[in-house]
Structure formats: C-alpha cells, structure tokens
A protein has these predicted regions:
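Extended, well-ordered alpha-helical scaffold/bundle regions in very large, multi-domain proteins
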Residues: 64-69, 73-97
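Metal-assisted phosphate- and nucleotidyl-transfer catalytic regions
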Residues: 93-107
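An acidic intrinsically disordered interaction segment
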Residues: 1-13
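An N-terminal structural lobe/cap that precedes and organizes the functional/catalytic core
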Residues: 52-62, 66
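Residue-level detector of short coil/turn "hinge" positions at structural boundaries
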Residues: 60-62, 84, 371-372
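Conserved mixed alpha/beta core segments that line enzyme active sites in large multi-domain catalysts
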Residues: 10-54, 103-502, 522, 549-550, ...
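Polybasic, proline/glycine-rich intrinsically disordered low-complexity segments
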Residues: 503-545
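A polyampholytic, Gly/Pro-enriched intrinsically disordered region
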Residues: 83-89, 375, 517-522
Length: 584
C-alpha cells in the first residue's frame, strides 16, 4: 500500500467498534497519511510473515485505532479561515491559539463524540501527515502527539479534550520546526496535509499513573548505532514508561539485537547510576492539571524509579547496584540503588524479548520492502501473560555509498574534526558555513541560550540555501539541558554534519534520540562524536581564529572561502570533517 492510500481501503468507524472485532477503522474521507498507511500495511502483512506460535510467551498485536482522513484537515482550515495565519510564519503559540478557536467539521462530530463515548481507556492523538514517515522525506518527530487520560465522567468533557487534541495536531503542521524541516527538504507548505490517528495508549494503571512496563525502538539497519556492531546487526533501545523517553532523546538502554548480553560502555558499574534512565513518563489519571489545550504534555507526568518500585513495575527489568563489589545484581530483591539495565530480560533470558524483536524486524522488512524502524510497548498482565504492542513501523533511508576514512587526512587536507565514533555513511562536499558553540567559558547551564541562537542561525541559513557544519557540546536534541543542547529537529534541519563534543566539565554518552536519528538518516547527515579525553580531535584553535565570525551569545558562525568536506565510514565508525590546507 502506498503512503497516500485512501481511507476508502479501511472500513468506516462503527459506533460499537469496541465489540465489533474491527481493529482499524476510519472517520471521514481522504488519505490516511504516512504513519497510518504504514500501520495498516504492517497489521495486514504480519499475518503472512510473522509466526506468533514461535513466541508463546507473548500476545502480539497492533493496537486498535481509528483514522480521521486528511480531507477533514482542509475543510477545517477553510471553514475557520485559518489559511492566512497558518502560512503567516507567526509564532507557534499564535497559530495554536487560532486553531483552538476553530470548530471541527460538523459532519464528523457525531463519530468523534461516539469514539469518546465508547473508548474509556487513555488515547493517543497522533499525527499522520502525507509526508510523514516517507523514506526520502522522513518527518519523524516533527509533528505533535497528545496523550489523553480520557477518564472524565462526562462524555462531553471527553469529547472537548479530544477535539482540542485534534486541533493541536493540526496546528503543529505549521509550527516553526515543521516549516523549517520542510524548507530544508525542499518541500512546500502547500504539499502537506494532515490525517489524525486515535489509538489506545498501551499500558496499565498504577494509581494515578498509566504507562507500559517497557517501551522500545528497534532498527534493522544502523549506520547510526552504538558499540562494536555491524550496520546490519541493527540497534534497539528500551525504556520504562511511555516511549516519549526514547524519542525525546532521554536516557535509555541501548543494545544490539545481535549482541543483547554485551557489556555496556560504562567505565564501571557505578557509572551506570548516572548514565541510565532515572525518570519515566506516564499519563496522568489523577487530578486534572490547569487547562492548557496548546501544551503537548498537558496530561503527562514524570516520576522517578522509587515511584516505579512502589507501582511494582521494576522487578522484571531492573538491577541493583552493590557498592561493596561495584557490581550490578539482577533484580530488586536487595537493598541499593536501582539501575534500569533490563538485565533480567536481556542477559538472564527471563523473557525472549530480543528474539521477538528480531523476528518482527524481519517481518516488517518483508512488509515494507527495506530496512525498518519499529516502535513498541510491552506490559506484564495480571494473569501472567505479556502483551507486545507494535505501535509504528517505518522505512529507513540507508546510504550504500562506499567511503573509507583512514588515520590521516588525504593530501591537501587538514582535519577540522576527527571521530572514532561517527554515525551515518557517505561523503558530502561543498559546505562553506560552520556554526559552533564557543569552548572557552562554556557551561551546560547556557544550553537553552545556545539552542535559541542556533535555531535563529538555522532559519537564516536554510532560507539562503546554505548547508552548514554544526559543532557543540553534549547530546544534541536532549530534553534535559544539562545533558545537551535542547534543540528540536527543525532548529538544526539545515546542518549536513553534526559534531557532539563532550562538555569540558564531564563526559556524556552519545545521543540516542530515535526520531532524531531517523531524520539524520533521511537527510544523510553525518553525526560525529568526540568523547572526553579527545578534545584535540576538534581543531578549536582554527575555529577561534576565523576572522569576522558572527557571534550570537555563546554561538559563532563563520562563512568559509574554501568549502569543507565531510566523510563518514559507516562500517568502521570513523569520520572526518576536512578543511583545505592553507597556503602562505
């Protein structure tokens, strides 16, 4: 099925669909959008390519969902006179407020109201645009998803919250990050239309929190990977709670499906206390927060590992740190700090999760016709069963260009950046702009200031059609400003090589944001990491000597007379950003 498949291929929404046995229904007309089309293809193809009897420990499914066809998007804009503000370049909040004042098409209200009357579990209201999840134009993570508790006693209140969420997803089509992304990709705003997915949130309720025991992302091919693995080995990430922890670039457990028991890249077991997940996301099922329909996280809460242990959700996925031996002991039977390393599952084989993930990656490749990325959630059911829900599957862009990066630069070139932990694959030339965070006096508390300056420079360089190299400290795209610079993808969409240097004050593991790396792959962006102790692998002196460099807060921008060359060898993990030798 094509990415632009119509909703006519899906049965119409039945107002008793919870008991109808139908798992995929539609409201309205028009295309499904990329995300929904991919899910429909997978849900139909798994019956042919996946053999669940090989994994009797699991109940595998694609969660029940309903799609609001993309035609409603155009009707909503037209009937409410929103085209002018949508295309005005106004701030996100102005656009969001204008969309909230609009009314959804009257002919769809009955089905949407019935959806909230029938469905009393938490709902995810997700984007599914025409351009989203395309192999060559992946808008992963650019548009918004809103989670709703959907537990208000009043059906009218549930319907109002659903309507607000739809309008927020619609508005995000024209937010700054989305516009910048499309501009960098050469796609016009008039090419985009938005369908919307309503999907049950997978998880279980624990007091006022609703969340899955495990969320995960896995990729069958990994130019963007970690550890001593081959690209074809793929890579996977696991986290406690909602998958937002992973896709926002938060700390998660990263491993190769080919080597799930490999030792983590930490200097010691004690180091894992700082480099593994300590907080998780959940849907707030308790007292409603202050009403704010334009905030994506309005109904989400964050909690720590003590709360998870109280909920009883750590026992099968965590280990305990033993200070006396500097070791991690599987499980939580002993006293001590908890570490989310998923060792009971991955190392001690209490559940064949890794085998299931590998089988599903293979099946999804067969369905979609190439390397894939999947998102999933797992819950341990009260009766002893385990539910594995496949939430998303998308094609990945994979470069097969052959590049060899040696120890030394080729003749006539000098190394601006050298990395032994580079991600991506390929060669990019003709980059005549470089944007970097100044090293002297840098402190991570200035991350938000740096992010704003970089976003401003990115907008200008994208509008001028000038790709650039971006160099900074910590994890690009991290939601935690103490771990990295909190940019969204649209803030850096014009970069064609990104360098992640360890902050002067402490080392930080390489960034792992799922949607972030999907976009890197789609744009063929090289991602070069320079760890602590290898500060000399960035020629800071040459950067600081650029006469006439523009300054915006802690960020510098220089336009070069001689373009840079970026080379990344995906198989060896080596990369270089090269500058021409200067003649005197």
């Amino acid at each position: 099925m094509s990415q632009a498949a119509g909703v006519e291929d899906v049965p119409p929404f039945d107002r008793s669909f919870l008991t109808s046995g139908c798992t995929f229904t539609r409201i309205g007309s028009g295309p499904l959008g990329g995300k929904a089309s991919g899910l429909l293809t997978i849900s139909r193809g798994l019956a042919r390519l996946f053999h669940p009897e090989a994994f009797p420990s699991f109940a595998v499914d694609v969660p029940r969902l309903t799609v609001l066809g993309a035609d409603a998007f155009g009707v909503f804009l037209r009937e409410n006179g929103l085209f002018d503000v949508a295309l005005s370049g106004a701030p996100d909040q102005v656009i969001a407020d204008a969309f909230q004042r609009g009314s959804l098409p009257a002919h769809l209200v009955g089905d949407l109201r019935a959806l909230t009357e029938e469905m009393r579990r938490p709902l995810a209201v997700r984007s599914s645009s025409l351009l989203e999840d395309a192999r060559d134009l992946p808008l992963a993570g650019v548009y918004l998803t809103k989670m709703l508790p959907n537990n208000q006693p009043d059906a009218d209140a549930r319907f109002r919250r659903l309507s607000e969420a739809v309008k927020l997803v619609y508005a995000s089509t024209y937010f700054r990050a989305a516009r910048a992304y499309r501009a960098a990709a050469g796609a016009g705003d008039d090419e985009e239309r938005m369908a919307v997915i309503f999907q049950e949130v997978v998880g279980r309720r624990h007091g006022d929190r609703f969340y899955p025991h495990v969320s995960g992302v896995a990729r069958s091919w990994a130019w963007y990977r970690t550890g001593r693995t081959r690209p074809e080995d793929g890579v996977a990430q696991l986290a406690l709670g909602l998958g937002k922890q992973i896709v926002d670039g938060g700390l998660s457990w990263v491993f190769s499906p080919a080597r799930p028991k490999a030792r983590p890249p930490f200097a010691s077991a004690r180091a894992s206390l700082k480099e593994t997940q300590t907080e998780f996301w959940a849907v707030n099922m308790g007292r409603p927060p202050a009403h704010d329909p334009t905030r994506e996280t309005e109904y989400l809460v964050r909690a720590g590992l003590p709360e998870a242990e109280f909920d009883g959700t750590l026992g099968r996925i965590a280990s305990t740190y033993d200070a006396a031996s500097d070791r991690l002991l599987p499980g939580i039977a002993r006293e001590g700090p908890r570490v989310l390393d998923f060792a009971p599952i991955l190392v001690h084989d209490s559940l064949p999760l890794n085998g299931l993930v590998r089988a599903l990656l293979l099946a999804c490749e067969g369905c979609l016709g190439g390397p894939v990325e999947i998102e999933f959630a797992l819950t341990f059911e009260p009766g002893g069963g385990v539910r594995f829900a496949l939430l998303q599957s998308r094609l990945m862009a994979v470069s097969q260009q052959l590049v060899e990066v040696g120890e030394d630069p080729p003749p006539g070139w000098k190394a601006l950046v050298t990395s032994r932990d580079a991600m991506g694959n390929g060669s990019t030339e003709g980059i005549a702009d470089v944007v970097w965070v100044e090293r002297r006096g840098w402190e991570m508390r200035r991350s938000a200031e740096a992010a704003a300056a970089i976003a401003a420079l990115n907008r200008r360089l994208v509008s001028e059609g000038r790709p650039y190299v971006l160099i900074g400290f910590g994890r690009w795209g991290s939601a935690d400003p103490w771990l990295g610079i909190p940019v969204a993808w649209g803030d850096i969409a014009g970069a064609r090589a990104i360098v992640e240097a360890s902050p002067p004050e402490r080392g930080i593991e390489v960034s792992q944001g799922s949607h972030f790396f999907h976009n890197l792959a789609g744009f063929r962006v090289g991602y070069l990491s320079v760890p602590a102790g290898r500060e000399g692998d960035v020629d800071w002196g040459w950067l600081e000597a650029r006469a006439g460099a523009e300054s915006i807060g802690p960020v510098r921008h220089a336009r070069l007379e001689q373009p840079l060359l970026v080379e990344v060898d995906g198989r060896s993990g080596r990369g270089m950003i090269l500058r021409r030798e200067e003649t005197t």
